Amino acid sequence: MYEKKIPKDLSCGLNIAIEVIGGKWKSNLLANINKGIKRPSELHKSIPQASARVLNQQLSELEFHGIVTKKIHNVLPPKVEYSLTSGGESILEVLYAMKSWGESYKKTFHEIIKYEG
């Protein structure tokens, strides 16, 4: 089994939060699920620049960490829906605060991030 050379520091709450919600599309997924977009195909349409494989991987990670729940309906064709858990709902306030911070400093960081490689 693969073992990371540098173990994750889980003694800090911030590191744990970043580990759970730190993914390129996780904040978008959580915001869209909160808006009522619950099916994987709808989530992919709402984030077209992300591949379905990556979105499914990140949804699986969010489910594993207890941030979202996945409900599989027993119908044909199969129907899957995601919803936020109480942990997922509680992280929204943090995500929206980060969004507000980003909006406030957008001009400051836009050029730096644009040319960051």
Predicted regions and their residues:
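Residues within the DNA-recognition helix of helix-turn-helix
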Residues: 58
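Acidic-glycine-rich active-site phosphate/pyrophosphate-binding loop
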Residues: 1-7
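Short beta-strand His + acidic residue motifs that chelate non-heme Fe in jelly-roll/DSBH
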Residues: 71
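N-terminal helix-turn-helix DNA-binding core of bacterial DNA-binding proteins
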Residues: 8-54, 74, 81
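Basic, amphipathic "hinge/linker" alpha-helix immediately C-terminal to the N-terminal HTH DNA-binding motif
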Residues: 74-98
